[in-house]
Amino acid sequence: MDSSSDEVLFVGTADAEHVEMYLKAIWHIKERNEPVKISTIAKMLNIRQPSVVQMLKKLNGQQLVEYNKAGVSLTEGGEKVGSNMMRNSRVLEVLMDSSLKVKIDEEMVCGIEHHMNKQFTDALCTMLN
């Protein structure tokens, strides 16, 4: 097989996607002006509370959230990732609904949003007005 025609496949990092989903969930809960609680995150992500605690400790160590007995809040870095994920999600929803005229498929949106970079999202925004 000629090396110029070799197909390159990219494998996403599930760990990075998990981090993004937690940050998006926290951002979304905060946006609704609700207290960010472990139980709320667990319910939103359909996972058990001990798993949420474990991930919050990890995110705290990565300085993406501030997690302590008082609660959970996003750091500046966590806020940036969370808001980017929400933006990607909303742009995809507008694309599906307004341009493609298909029913919004949240599972599909969730699968795509993790792979969008700023340039792609900006281009979609421009295309969608």
Language-model segments: which ranges?
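Short alpha-helical segments that sit at the start of domains
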Residues: 1-24
